[in-house]
């Protein structure tokens, strides 16, 4: 056991109620099938409320009208969020046309939401349309299995449109990892696809009868781009190439961003380097990491159940050695790799295969027909003629991939005619928010609806200080769960209450440093006042090429988080230099 962090391999104590629920669920069936036929409520009852998450759904309601409905003695307007499993974010144009139609015909909001998990979500699916959405996805070769709850979630892969061969190889591994770590229960097929029940006992050789202690996230990343924010994830395979061909991966384990306000047992953490592995060991190593976390993760306290906490409790070396034992390998030393950025390159780029790729900026990932900007219709029209594929990025944007020279002008005209290609500032391109209100039940403050106007104000500050073409990686998340990845931003806003946020500073542009809380529970005017002063200093005092986050650390404005298990919460509201 590590001398630095000695602790038990298994946490003893009363199991959380989620563990009971999983054990009693009959491999994730529960009584979901019966609940579907209950027309007295628009939601799912009892354990089914949580069990549907294993099937890719969350039960939500419209919080904008919750109080109004309560006054009318009505239950909340329940509706489901469904998240598709889409390893690497690649979707065919045929599949896109199907999801476009479903969103228009069968959801309350009529939108498609691209997420920073490199997939799409439907919001506002009424109970009567839950089974049809799964059947629609199946009809075009998609599913929503294991995109939520205590499983390996959608596997991310760098959206690299330039080096087509390397991207293709990395993407294939993302798919293989996703398939290898899927649950084996037939519950999904039986409930949603009406497949016949088989008179055999379900087995889960990798995930186990009670699945994982907590959600688990995996990435495949191609340096020098860190577009998938590897340090937000439990398990990361960093592609190592020789002469443009993939030869193996560096493995990093134990990243994660979610915290709980005021709970100092929770913290954001960057992933730890384990070592290098040749390609042929990839699936064995992935399985070994997952099963080690399955067996050693904390099942008594879900707030302390993620892989990052397991590593801190047992020690990185102990966890790594167990992975080696289970996989039957010894990691080689980490091979050199470097990240230089994580934003998407908006506009056209030409790949080495001579095909063109058009990256479209989709603010907050929300695809809808807005007045004067019919984005959803535009993408549908492109999907009808495009013979390549679409790629959803981890920055909530969309790539029209593999466009031949002969189609380039036609696709660009469609994009421009529908408001999909507009001049966008570097600051807006590098700003992102989670959904939050009105649909997320965990939301404490606005995020998606807040960010566009807030970005306008930050742009005005940059203009005021003579640096309008600069950018700061900025993220807003409506609660401390961290879906907006604010804990890897240069400016991170974390919702605390309606209209109030914690302001975190000191991350960097490449996403390898956790920002520290600078001010707590403050309003938008307070945030903007602080940013005005700090950005003014950055504009005058920065070194050549120095990003805002690096400047705040170098200038002593914020102390960097060096060892989050011990110093993430240190010196709240600390201002080490006058601003």
Swiss-Prot record:
Protein name (database record): Sulfite reductase [NADPH] hemoprotein beta-component
Pathways per UniProt: Sulfur metabolism; hydrogen sulfide biosynthesis; hydrogen sulfide from sulfite (NADPH route): step 1/1
Gene Ontology BP annotations: cysteine biosynthetic process; hydrogen sulfide biosynthetic process; sulfate assimilation
Cofactor detail note: Binds 1 siroheme per subunit.
Top EC class for this record: oxidoreductase
Gene: cysI
Positions annotated to bind siroheme: 483
Record's GO cellular component terms: sulfite reductase complex (NADPH)
The protein's role, per its UniProt record: Component of the sulfite reductase complex that catalyzes the 6-electron reduction of sulfite to sulfide. This is one of several activities required for the biosynthesis of L-cysteine from sulfate.
Native species: Salmonella choleraesuis (strain SC-B67)
């Amino acid at each position: 056991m590590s001398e630095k962090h000695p602790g038990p391999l298994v946490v003893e104590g009363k199991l959380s109620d989620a563990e009971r629920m999983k054990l009693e669920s009959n491999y994730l069936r529960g009584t979901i099938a019966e609940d579907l036929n209950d027309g007295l409520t628009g939601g799912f009852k009892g354990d089914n409320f949580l069990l549907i998450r294993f099937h890719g759904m969350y039960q939500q309601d419209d919080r904008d009208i919750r109080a109004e409905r309560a006054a009318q003695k009505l239950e909340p307007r329940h509706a489901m969020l469904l998240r598709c499993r889409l390893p690497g974010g690649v979707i065919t144009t045929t599949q896109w046309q199907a999801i476009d139609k479903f969103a228009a015909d069968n959801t309350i909001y009529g939108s498609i939401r691209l997420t920073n998990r490199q997939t799409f979500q439907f919001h506002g699916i009424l109970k009567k349309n839950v089974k049809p959405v799964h059947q629609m996805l199946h009809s075009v070769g998609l599913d929503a299995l294991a995109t939520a709850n205590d499983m390996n979630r959608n596997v991310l892969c760098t959206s690299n449109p330039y080096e087509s061969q390397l991207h293709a190889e990395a993407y294939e591994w993302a798919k293989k990892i996703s398939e290898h770590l899927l649950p084996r229960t037939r519950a999904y097929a039986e409930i949603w696809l009406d497949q016949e029940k088989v008179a055999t006992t379900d087995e889960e050789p990798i995930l186990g009868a009670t699945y994982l202690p907590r959600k688990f996230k995996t990435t495949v990343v191609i340096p020098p781009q860190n577009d998938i924010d590897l340090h937000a994830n439990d398990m990361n395979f960093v592609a190592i190439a020789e002469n443009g061909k993939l030869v193996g991966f560096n493995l990093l384990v134990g990243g994660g961003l979610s915290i709980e306000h005021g709970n100092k047992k929770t913290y954001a953490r960057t992933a730890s380097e384990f070592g290098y592995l040749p390609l042929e060991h990839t699936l064995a190593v992935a399985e070994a990491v997952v099963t080690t976390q399955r067996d050693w993760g904390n099942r008594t306290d879900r707030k302390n159940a993620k892989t990052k906490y397991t590593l801190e409790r047992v020690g990185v070396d102990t966890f790594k050695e167990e992975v080696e034992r289970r996989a039957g390998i010894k990691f080689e030393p980490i091979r050199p790799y470097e990240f230089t950025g994580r934003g998407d390159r908006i506009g056209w780029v030409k790949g080495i295969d001579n095909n063109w790729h058009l990256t479209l900026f989709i603010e907050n990932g929300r695809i809808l027909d807005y007045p004067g900007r019919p984005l959803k219709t535009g993408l549908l029209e492109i999907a009808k003629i495009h013979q390549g594929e679409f790629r959803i990025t981890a920055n909530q944007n969309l790539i029209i991939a593999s466009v031949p020279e002969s189609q380039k002008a036609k696709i660009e005209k469609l994009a421009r005619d529908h408001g999909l290609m507009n001049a966008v500032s570097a600051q807006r391109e590098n700003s992102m928010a989670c959904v939050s209100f009105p649909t997320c039940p965990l939301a404490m403050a606005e995020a998606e609806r807040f960010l566009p106007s807030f970005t306008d104000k930050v742009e005005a500050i940059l203009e005021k200080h003579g640096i309008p073409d600069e950018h700061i990686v900025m993220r807003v998340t409506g609660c401390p769960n961290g879906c907006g990845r604010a804990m890897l931003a240069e400016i991170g806003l974390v919702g605390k209450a309606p209209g109030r946020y914690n302001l975190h500073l000191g991350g960097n542009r490449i996403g390898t440093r956790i920002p520290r809380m600078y001010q707590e529970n403050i309003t938008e005017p307070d945030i903007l006042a602080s940013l005005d002063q700090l950005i003014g200093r950055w504009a005058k005092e920065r070194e050549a090429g120095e990003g805002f986050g690096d400047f705040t650390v170098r200038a002593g404005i914020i102390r960097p988080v060096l060892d989050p298990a011990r110093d993430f919460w240190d010196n709240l509201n600390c201002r080490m230099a006058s601003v």
